[in-house]
């Protein structure tokens, strides 16, 4: 699985007329009850980061919010709040298709891309109104801290992680603002110029969705973060950058669909040649592994790559389990097939696969069969020098599983920023999607609860992303110069050895 939620929210549309159509209290309560029961029966990660008491508490809050008819968008925000609270980056919640076929009309979007730099909201676009690099303190009298907190629910991350939400905010700020606060034709912005303390006020005009998208494509930081938001063409690369240092870059693990796929086999051949070269050139004592743009992908690319970095046997998981063998609430399930008979066959095939991989019931959990989690061996040409692992908030799913193994089971010096994917585990692999009966909101989550095969470490905190040994973030000066701060830091660290 991989985290690819940016495009969902960059392009989520909604019809202004539909906002005025309200769901009755009965319909709202029925949908929320169905939603709650689905999570309890099917979602093995429901209590991974939250206790039952905490989970019951947020549902009590949710039910208290629907004592009168509500517009679909308002109910959607309640559901988002719950799915974000659960703490899984594979949780996706989408509006009905008729909300996704047309965009809001008019010049109602905040015009300029922004980016979080050193926890400050910075203008990320050259323009004549609010200069590039300016810090934003408030918009329409809403303080930045309040703005950002209200946007967190739109972009889920593992556990209690906050750093990963910066990816969603930078990619979808204008969409989040419209969704949260409604259409605005004017924006009163309180800001300061780069490296200045004086606060200024400027009223700027909203733009159309088309201009918003065009401005994002032309953002200042594009040379640095293009791979975090666009289609990845160059998925991996290897090069020798100094006589004693090589760089392995893996921008995604979406490299073929399975172990037999030609694209995966080509990747395997590439890794073989790279590490055979390193094995034959022992003067290369340093390997930089850059996975900062890696939002995940497919098995077995992540664990195959790790085999070239370790000297000891390893597994993908310490434990994996699901809550069910027969899909709960099949009437609300979203099927790929459209004909009832084929839907029945689709469900039965899915359930047979679940029963094969998770056959044994122990303490209310269906445990993964060991044959699906074999003990794996290091490659004969695995690297034996010093590893430097570059990480960022973008790393998720299979990307964070790989990074956690490299962090916990190699000599890697981990450099960069906390990932959105967890160190100790996550819910992943197998997604299911349901549609609520009245609102037609779709909710997707992954059903396999994974505990990753990593040791406990003092600096790795349960419920957080992978925390670097050396936190290195872009400064405002680096941002303005589009400087690759983490990479340059790593090269200097190697030079000082």
Where are these regions (language model features)?
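Bacterial Sec-dependent N-terminal signal peptides
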Residues: 1-22
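Alpha-helical structural elements
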Residues: 6-9, 30, 42, 345, ...
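Flexible, low-complexity junctional segments that flank or bridge functional domains
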Residues: 20-322, 329, 333-338, 423-436, ...
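Conserved acidic, small-residue-rich alpha-beta core segments centered on
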Residues: 134, 299-479, 493
